[in-house]
Amino acid sequence: MEQITITAKVQIVATDTDKVLLNKTMSVYCDACNYVSDYVFRTHDLKQFSLNKILYSTLREKFSLKSQMAQSVFKTVIARYKTILENQNEWIKPSFKKPQYDLVWNRDYSLTQNCFSVNTLNGRVKLPYFAEGMSKYFNHSIYRFGTAKLVNKHGKYYLHIPVTYEVEESNISDICNVVGIDRGINFVVATYDSKHKSGFVSGKAIKQKRANYSRLRKELQMRHTPSSRRRLKAIGQRENRWMQDINHQVSKALATGNPKHTLFVLEDLTGIRNVTERVKTKDRYVSVSWSFYDLEQKLIYKAKQNQSSVIKVDPRHTSQCCPACGHTEKSNRNKKIHLFTCKNCGYTSNDDRIGAMNLYRMGINYLADSQVPNTVVTE
């Protein structure tokens, strides 16, 4: 069995009195995080044991935090610093600006009688919730809750709950279908599978919408006003949410639209940013900021849910190699009109489809090298 963790976002319903208690708790928790962050930045001490020994009493007395809340503050700050060190490889002090509150399951929050019981500085409050689309995760014989995060977005309160559950691990010997997936801008994905069927998800409308976002961003950047900066930030967040939703839809369609025990083959796009930064300036925004990685991560965990697997392969020549005769030549591909024409045998097709076909073939070779029985239809 293999464990999968997803985040369930559950909206909770709070009365005006509850909101006051929640806001106060979130604000104090945030202040405590900044206090601990200052100390960690000065000392570079990331050991919870020593932080607890030095700062625990202060958090209890100065911020009136309960025991578990104080421990959660240490964990929140330590996790933020570790993320920064992994990504930046240097000590940068994080600032906790937005009120937040991390809640430990069965200590700071629990689920009873169709309500979440949430701990605050002034005792527990019981909060009803909207269960649409989330109720299946509340079966604790299957799903386990982790440390949740309480957030306030535009006056609405949400619990972001990590939910862990087990699925049957995909065994390579069970593979019955291979899908090559070429990711790009003209087509978000082009696919080719074991039934020799091709599929495309057009990126035209997405590209146009992102171009509109880019133009609006440039206009706002020229104004240099506080309101324009606020709107710039809001637009960036809106665009990210929209693109993540697109990737969610595409990855879900790929994972559920294919049978269980499918092997998805992707190009390993590590270092793609360095490549795309050499494109024309007018095309650079779309190329560099395109969220290939987000789509990849969503497909990986959705594939696991369907007892399928994802592998990444060397992307070199996937759009230059003829799937019919194997002839590889750069001039086989005409990027301007997205057409592939083999200089050796004359085979012609869309260049993104060619990429998907070659990725499919690499998946077949991967299975052959792994000595998997003939469970996949090949050409």
Language model regions located:
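Nucleic-acid substrate recognition interfaces
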Residues: 1-379
